């Protein structure tokens, strides 16, 4: 018989830096999950990813307090900021431009995000990421 799902917990945790402090501890503690077990498993799974990059994770908590988790790719905005070499996007994206990204960088980000975005072609994902870039005050070249 399959285990009964008790809850789904969605978090963004820095790669390789999960620890019992907020937001991880309180979110998992409410569900009765062994927090350190999750932290060790998450850090082991994300050790190949650049340390500190925020990784969305969906944790499935079962009624017997066991859990499984699925990691996603980093948010497009984070990858765009990294590609453009900026700390944050523009507060006024239509007026103040804060950086530039090339079409090649956009394609690379789209191919990275392809695992999470189902049913869309790379070109469609590129257009979506270009829109995100423009809304952050980045100029898309090429």
Swiss-Prot record:
Show the GO MF annotations. Answer: large ribosomal subunit rRNA binding; structural constituent of ribosome
The yes or no answer to whether the keyword Cell membrane is present is no
Keywords, comma-separated and alphabetical: Methylation, Ribonucleoprotein, Ribosomal protein, RNA-binding, rRNA-binding
Describe PTMs of this protein.
Answer: One or more lysine residues are methylated.
The UniProt entry's GO CC annotations, sorted and at most eight, read: cytosolic large ribosomal subunit
The superkingdom of the source organism is Bacteria
Q: What InterPro entries does the annotation carry?
A: Ribosomal_uL11, Ribosomal_uL11_bac-typ, Ribosomal_uL11_C, Ribosomal_uL11_C_sf, Ribosomal_uL11_CS, Ribosomal_uL11_N, Ribosomal_uL11_N_sf
Subunit annotation: Part of the ribosomal stalk of the 50S ribosomal subunit. Interacts with L10 and the large rRNA to form the base of the stalk. L10 forms an elongated spine to which L12 dimers bind in a sequential fashion forming a multimeric L10(L12)X complex.
- This chain's protein is named Large ribosomal subunit protein uL11
Q: Which gene encodes it?
A: rplK
């Amino acid at each position: 018989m399959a285990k009964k799902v008790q809850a789904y917990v969605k978090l963004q945790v820095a790669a390789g830096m999960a620890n019992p402090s907020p937001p991880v501890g309180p979110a998992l503690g409410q569900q009765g999950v062994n927090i350190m077990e999750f932290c060790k498993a998450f850090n082991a799974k994300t050790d190949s990813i650049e340390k500190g990059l925020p990784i969305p994770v969906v944790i499935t908590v079962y009624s017997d307090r066991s859990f499984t988790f699925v990691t996603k790719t980093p948010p497009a905005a984070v990858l765009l900021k990294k590609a453009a070499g900026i700390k944050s996007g523009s507060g006024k994206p239509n007026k103040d431009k804060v950086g530039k990204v090339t079409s090649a960088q956009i394609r690379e980000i789209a191919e990275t995000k392809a695992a999470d975005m189902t049913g869309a072609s790379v070109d469609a994902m590129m257009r979506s990421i270009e829109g995100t870039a423009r809304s952050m005050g980045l100029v898309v070249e090429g």
